[in-house]
Amino acid sequence: MRKLGFAITMLVAFAVGPAPLAQSAEGFAKALHIYDNYRVVPNITYLTANNWDAKLDVYQARDAKGPNPTLIYFHGGGWVQGSKEAASLTFLPFLEMGWNVVNVEYRLGKVSLAPAAVQDALCALRWVYRNGKDYNVDTGRLVLMGNSAGGHLALTTGMIPASAGLDSLCPGTEELKVAAIINWYGIIDVNELLAGPNVRNYAIAWLGGMSNRDEIAKRVSPLTYVRTGLPPIISIQGDADPTVPYSQNVRLHQALDNAGVGNMFVTVPGGKHGGFSDAEMAKVYAEIRGFLDKQNIARLSAN
């Protein structure tokens, strides 16, 4: 009954979601394909904060043999909206590759302001480290991915060191290392979005009226943590993105180059904030697969 309820929730999320695919028969068909062909363990509580249970879903091929590479996915929505259920089609290509997927929800701004979402994402990664063996997860081949605010969270989760103190809600001794980060048009410099020509209402809403918001914004900005030794990072963005300034990801990859971090920046010419064509998506996923192959991440376990 629990899984049936989850399937219905997922289908409803697609039906009311913002993406055109979510409103189409194709979207429903793909949602049913996921439910029919993959084992889904839904709504596992990985953290309780602000009297709110943060949950995640684990997806696996029904005939999975492990341990296998695993994608940890964070949905978008400007840190103030969105849901994990409405994002499931985004990571379908990884399921088709035989990967496990961990689909994470986190505290939105209406529950708790920044840096809550960043803290939650770090706790989700720690949960995977502690529980992954129960789901055939190869913790040596963890890849973080997200779009927009989720891209930001994928970056912060893979870049923020323990010394930053942002994992205080789930302390532990595990070194939270990941094999790669896939950033779809994520926010790189939160401070830049709080004032000036690139101000964005969603960033202001996430930081609220806190007196130290500039300090918090810097603490949760991926650009703050660029340094030697980071995992390889691939970013994807349209150069006509009206929601997240394209220049932010240009700056990120310039900084990664300067730090000697393996990286790749895939630009979609004329692309907006997602909504890329099928042909563009095919090219992007070919680039992602090639990038992961170079890191020796994509292969499945032979066990």
List the predicted regions and their residue ranges.
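Alpha/beta-hydrolase superfamily serine-hydrolase fold, recognizing
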Residues: 23-303
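Bacterial N-terminal signal peptides
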Residues: 7-17
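Positively charged n-region of N-terminal signal peptides that target proteins for export
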Residues: 1-4
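Sec/Tat signal peptide C-region and signal peptidase I cleavage site
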Residues: 18-22
